[in-house]
Amino acid sequence: MGQPLPPVALLLLVSASSRAADVPKALVLLDPPWASVLKDDHVTLKCQGLHPAGDNTTQWLHNGSLLSSQAPAYTITAARAEDGGEYRCQTGLSSLSDPVQLRVHLGWLVLQAPRWVFQEGEPIQLRCHSWKNNKLHKVTYLQNGRGLRYFHQNSDLHIPEATRNHSGSYFCRGLIRHHNVSSETVTITVQGPANPVVSSSVLPWHQIAFCLVMGLLLAADTGLYFSVQRDLRSSQRARKEHTLGWSLGSQDK
């Protein structure tokens, strides 16, 4: 009969099983990658997540309501105001994704970005987009009411590395035919760089609770383990002494 595993080995086995049970989150991606669009724009939302073999069923939520589509990609052929809002998705082997916001604007221009919150050091790409891709020229990007960059022909504005100074309100303006048009103002926020060491060391509450419970069990189990080992050694020693005493008594006779 084999010996029982010591407490540390048992803890390692249970911990490995717990990690294997963790389910990854699905991820919603926009294609094109812009978080704001104009009415009648074409947008595709793609759900990245794990699927069971042969089953690509995907659940889509829009503002908390379940959509009828169960395809991995959800397409909006001509965006309307009511298409704006929060989108989430889930696959068979992935948990519910974090929300992605889509804004649908009415007007001639919209200032587009992949998102509105950036970390220091990240690149920022801004695009001045016209309704139905009408030709746009003499384009100016403005930050906090001041001209930031001018393009005679429409072009994206690239900021290679974001700093706190890039936080603020932005809009763009230009000419369509001979008409001056402007986008609505948007707010871009640049936050301090994320600390990967700190963020990776923060555990979800259920893992913290698991570690606390396993620590208590380990302490109790370890005490019991060594207590049994001590009693076993004492019992073996007493048995040897008894055998030796009996043997000596027999020789005296």
Swiss-Prot record:
Organism superkingdom: Eukaryota
Entry keyword set: Cell membrane, Disulfide bond, Glycoprotein, IgG-binding protein, Immunity, Immunoglobulin domain, Membrane, Receptor, Repeat, Signal, Transmembrane, Transmembrane helix
Ig-like C2-type domain mapped to chain residues: 24-105, 120-189
Locations listed in the record: Cell membrane
An example Gene Ontology biological process: antibody-dependent cellular cytotoxicity
Stretches of the chain found on the membrane's Extracellular side: 21-207
One GO CC annotation: external side of plasma membrane
Pfam families, alphabetized: Ig_2
Disulfide bond positions: C47-C89, C128-C172
Membrane topology: Single-pass membrane protein
Cytoplasmic-facing ranges: 227-253
An example molecular function term from Gene Ontology annotations: IgG receptor activity
Signal peptide: 1-20
Cited function: Receptor for the invariable Fc fragment of immunoglobulin gamma (IgG). Optimally activated upon binding of clustered antigen-IgG complexes displayed on cell surfaces, triggers lysis of antibody-coated cells, a process known as antibody-dependent cellular cytotoxicity (ADCC). Does not bind free monomeric IgG, thus avoiding inappropriate effector cell activation in the absence of antigenic trigger. Mediates IgG effector functions on natural killer (NK) cells.
Subunit structure of this chain's protein: Forms a heterooligomeric complex with ITAM-containing signaling subunits FCER1G. Interacts (via transmembrane domain) with signaling subunits; this interaction is a prerequisite for receptor complex expression on the cell surface and intracellular signal transduction. Binds the Fc region of antigen-complexed IgG.
Name used for this protein in its record: Low affinity immunoglobulin gamma Fc region receptor III-B
Source organism per UniProt: Oryctolagus cuniculus
